[in-house]
Amino acid sequence: MPWALPFLFLFGVLIVAGCQPDRDPLPEGFDIQGHRGAMGLKPENTLPGFFKAVDLGVTTIEFDLAVSKEHKMVISHEPWFRADICLQPDGSPIPRDLERSFRLYEMSFETIEQFDCGSLQHPSHPDQQTLFAIKPLMSEAIEMIDDYARSQGVPPIGYNIEIKSDPAWDGSLTPEPAVFARLLHEELLALEKRLETPLLDRITVQSFDPRPLHALRAIAPTIPIAILTYTEGTVDDHLRFFGLEPEIYSPNYGLVTAEQVQRAHELGMRVIPWTVNRKADMQRMVEYGVDGLITDYPDRFNELFPRP
């Protein structure tokens, strides 16, 4: 029956279309966080990376903090200059066996900003664009990101700030945790006053180390806290380890289960796993019901979940 072929074709198209998943299953308020900016595409924890993250529509920029000799907040994943991604002020390489002697806590920011941490190809991100870039001050970075977002007609960006802290670093690579938390809080307050715009309500502070989180909670109880975990265990196990009730539970994505997400939600926490870079894992996290995710590749997330 040749006359029936067009109807059969149309019926088949409708069936296939009806079986397609929703193109945007994301719940309202889903938080796309650019890990160290957009680390897969631009040098980590640098202004070019932060601007790229804004261009890609992240709702939050995640970055790490170290402290300079004069107690300024410097954006850096390590409290030293890594030999594989940074060059000395004269352009010479940093000896790998001596990299931990290049301590930010023993340098003024005037010295820190002379190091190039963007021109070397990142060993784990071969597609990352290389360009001259420095470790910026937190205050200057937030102000410039806010200005850039405003110029692009983008809603105010959130900031997820990781305090890099370890008992072995206390007093040598970083300040004592209570001092670190106080310095961060004071700088955020001063920055909010200078910008004359709400800032603290866009801040989250996270750490793998419970100590600075406890110190911050004591002096700034309204700032949301995220606990970072990379070990196996239940949500309750991790809460016992940290000894506080955070607003956000942030485990390594490889350890996340639907049951964990459900339990965290029962306890009133949002779940934002790290660092989710493969599309299949992004899809799985969304299916588990997470409230956001941290990724080096916001562009991949956009391809998977197109947004207006």
What do the PLM-derived regions correspond to, one by one?
Residues P6-I15:
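Bacterial N-terminal signal peptides
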Residues G18-P308:
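Phosphate-group recognition and catalysis centered on beta-loop-alpha active-site segments
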